[in-house]
Amino acid sequence: RPCPSQTHSLYRRALARPTETPTMLKIENLHARIGDKEILKGLSLDVKPGQVHAIMGPNGAGKSTLGNVLAGRDGYEVTEGSVQFDGVDLLEQDPEARAAAGLFLAFQYPVEIPGVNNTYFLRAALNAQRKARGEEELDSMQFLKLVRQKLAVLHLKDELLHRGVNEGFSGGEKKRNEIFQLAVLEPKLAILDETDSGLDIDALKSVADGVNALRGADRSFLVITHYQRLLDYIKPDVVHVLADGRIVKSGGPELALELEAHGYDFLKDRVVPEAAV
């Protein structure tokens, strides 16, 4: 048995030891397919709270499939591997439960919902999630106060509340509206699937400003993109290169610049053909 002085020394060392930040999202050896076509082929990834991870790669690498599988969209079958989100088995949950747990997917092509205005849609979505978590639903006044706070943070106008969901919106307006939805729903993990697709530079900056305004110690982002230009405005902590359904290289923001300079050809010697496995 240690003497009191030894016990005190052990206690002080334990206090001095840095506490490791828990992992928010842990993906291990994830395999997924659509029909007979396997798309994800052993993908592993760890994301900690507050981090921004960029997922880059050539067309057909599996970037959007990763986001869709995490969100639980129909048509994808997970055949192997595991996904833990805040210590819970994400793959066992339906899409609504995943959203209530704090996962948000911003679509590459946001859909229009004619005749349903943003206020009604967002209040219904938010209260459904609050109810699923056992929280009290917001009444009209509480909700209006919340959305006006979020509009101010994102420098958006009140008129957005009265428009139909993405109805008649330009590409940039649709993407800004999704960032507004993200702000109101306050997820723990936001997956942005090629948010920069089809945007001119002004719209891109506007969307990036919105994302940066929502960054925080408790919110993580997976930024899925084909091009480096989005990462000029949303600075990632980690950049991953996805090719043939696997992450083949990870690094800091400089990796995105390397891809911009040399393209994806340098990956060819890193991707092992299935026939050779």
Put a short name on every predicted segment.
Residues 25-27, 40:
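Conserved structural motif at the start of ABC-family nucleotide-binding domains
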Residues 204-217:
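Helical segment within the ABC ATPase nucleotide-binding domain
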